[in-house]
């Protein structure tokens, strides 16, 4: 059985790791290069580096900072933010990324995913989906609910259904979905489990649950109830609430297969 991955996330702005609530009110959370080194030593399974202002500021990812982060990181590294073209993907892979994440560009042109996957393989192409609840599930009425995608760092509504879009980009060649609930981001209230389950059930590739982790039980729920293949968290690790080791031990105790170091 494949091991469930625990992935710290570095949301980077102006060269610093930041953390907010619902994608706003960002506060400083440290130096990304130092954090990459620390998470590597702590036994994280992967690391996610997202330049969260690149698209909004209409620029590419900060390649120099990405390179320096990759140099300190000997676990798989996913880099995203401002990724638009095959050349962007190539440059980030050369900078040290193992996987590259599309977000806003994939919404504007899903074929960019196909072009990148054709060139480099689906195994290194991730599509990040930032979604808000527009209609909560109502099981008694048979309503599965609806979640809308937002782009440009969560600033721009699209009207696009998150579950249907996940199917589209996987058909185009995405090898993984990084799914963030904007409603839960930074709230420490737990993952949006109906959203996570809906997307996990809809696509045949791994889904990373993101947004809302406040306790170790939330990590477990993302897998057991949300169906995620991996769980991503930021605040609980950046600010020392829990360690990677504590998270893995808790998941193992719950019967979830994890890589114990």
Swiss-Prot record:
It is an enzyme of class 4 (lyase). One of its GO terms (biological process) is L-histidine biosynthetic process. Its main location: cytoplasm. InterPro entries: Aldolase_TIM (IPR013785), His_biosynth (IPR006062), HisF (IPR004651), IGPS_HisA/HisF (IPR050064), RibuloseP-bd_barrel (IPR011060). Keywords: Amino-acid biosynthesis, Cytoplasm, Histidine biosynthesis, Lyase. Its EC number is 4.3.2.10. It is found in: Cytoplasm. It catalyses: 5-[(5-phospho-1-deoxy-D-ribulos-1-ylimino)methylamino]-1-(5-phospho-beta-D-ribosyl)imidazole-4-carboxamide + L-glutamine = D-erythro-1-(imidazol-4-yl)glycerol 3-phosphate + 5-amino-1-(5-phospho-beta-D-ribosyl)imidazole-4-carboxamide + L-glutamate + H(+). Pathway: Amino-acid biosynthesis; L-histidine biosynthesis; L-histidine from 5-phospho-alpha-D-ribose 1-diphosphate: step 5/9. GO terms for cellular component: cytoplasm. Gene3D superfamilies: Aldolase class I. Disulfide bonds: none annotated. The active site is at 11, 130. Belongs to the HisA/HisF family. PANTHER family: IMIDAZOLE GLYCEROL PHOSPHATE SYNTHASE HISHF, IMIDAZOLE GLYCEROL PHOSPHATE SYNTHASE SUBUNIT HISF/H IGP SYNTHASE SUBUNIT HISF/H. HAMAP family: HisF. IGPS catalyzes the conversion of PRFAR and glutamine to IGP, AICAR and glutamate. The HisF subunit catalyzes the cyclization activity that produces IGP and AICAR from PRFAR using the ammonia provided by the HisH subunit. Heterodimer of HisH and HisF. This is Imidazole glycerol phosphate synthase subunit HisF. It comes from Jannaschia sp. (strain CCS1). The gene is hisF.
